[in-house]
Amino acid sequence: MAFITDPIADMLTRIRNATIRKHKNVSFQHSKTKVKILEIIQKAGYIKDFQVEGDLKKNITVELKYKGNLSSISGLKRISKPSLRVYTSASKIPFVQSGFGIAILSTSKGLLTDSQARKENVGGEIIAYIW
């Protein structure tokens, strides 16, 4: 297996590619951060469900959500990367697709959506946009 320099970008790319190909499920390696991001994406209604499988080498299987023939996810974009970190203050948290999408932020209070971060009045690192 190849060494992945940005596992979060790899996860988002796998989800994006699976939605383009109309796959029902997609799998990738487990990490706690990925699970937290998937919990946020699931609460926002972009995926049906996800499961952690395996004992020693854990994998995550995500069940994608479709409305008819269209995916619930129109787009995914990794913002802050290992080579270029992107931070924002609470007052400058961006609206994704004029409020129709979500931004996932890593804050001092954990991983939050853009709306949760505004309510908590905390800024942080912008992980990804999903719309």
UniProtKB/Swiss-Prot annotation:
GO terms for cellular component: ribonucleoprotein complex; ribosome. PANTHER family: 40S RIBOSOMAL PROTEIN S15A. It comes from Mesomycoplasma hyopneumoniae (strain 7448) (Mycoplasma hyopneumoniae). The keyword Ribosomal protein applies. It holds the Pfam family Ribosomal_S8. Belongs to the universal ribosomal protein uS8 family. Keywords: Ribonucleoprotein, Ribosomal protein, RNA-binding, rRNA-binding. InterPro entries: Ribosomal_uS8, Ribosomal_uS8_CS, Ribosomal_uS8_sf. Gene3D superfamilies: 3.30.1370.30, 3.30.1490.10. Part of the 30S ribosomal subunit. Contacts proteins S5 and S12. GO terms for molecular function: rRNA binding; structural constituent of ribosome. PROSITE patterns: RIBOSOMAL_S8. Coiled coil: none annotated. GO terms for biological process: translation. The keyword Thylakoid does not apply. One of the primary rRNA binding proteins, it binds directly to 16S rRNA central domain where it helps coordinate assembly of the platform of the 30S subunit. This is Small ribosomal subunit protein uS8.
